[in-house]
């Protein structure tokens, strides 16, 4: 189905995008976030994000293409221990933003960020922060095009428990980016 939707003639090549539903993640979506095993190691991270969503700490979004499934995701942390990222009132933190490779460069990522921004404005937030790997030039370009600005450097050090409950340490130097949003 995916290749049929994408690889048709030029005028029909992106008709699938009109069928994409951007909605809140539900529990049954969690296995699809593993992308056929590529992100299996993040299973506990996703489950914890879902639990935090149930406590009102996170807002989790997916892009769902009927008859294909979840093809994108973006998570928002409303309140963090690090108040410079998400303070619960003014600033929210965007993370775990992914679009499956075959659906990139189609406008879907921009559309998802637009949905997130509108939702955060309704919640009276005024700023979105994110960290992006310094080596991820395509993502940096997307964020800059969407109005985010680099405001600092982050060490990008964090840890998580993988699907085997083994502690994994990550070191991925990142740029901290910020965008002001308003009504």
Task: List where the protein language model places each region.
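Acetyl-CoA-dependent GNAT
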Residues: 6-9, 15-20, 24-102, 113-114, ...
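A generic structural micro-feature
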Residues: 86-91, 124, 167-173
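Active-site acidic-Proline motif in GNAT/NAT acetyltransferases
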Residues: 100-102, 106, 134-135
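Short glycine-rich hinge loops at helix-strand junctions in the catalytic core
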Residues: 107, 124, 147
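Short glycine/proline-centered loop/turn elements that form peptide/ligand docking sites
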Residues: 109, 113, 135-139, 155-162
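Conserved GNAT acetyl-CoA-binding A-motif
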Residues: 120-131
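Conserved catalytic-core motifs of GNAT/GCN5-like acyltransferases
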Residues: 131-132, 144, 149-168, 175-176
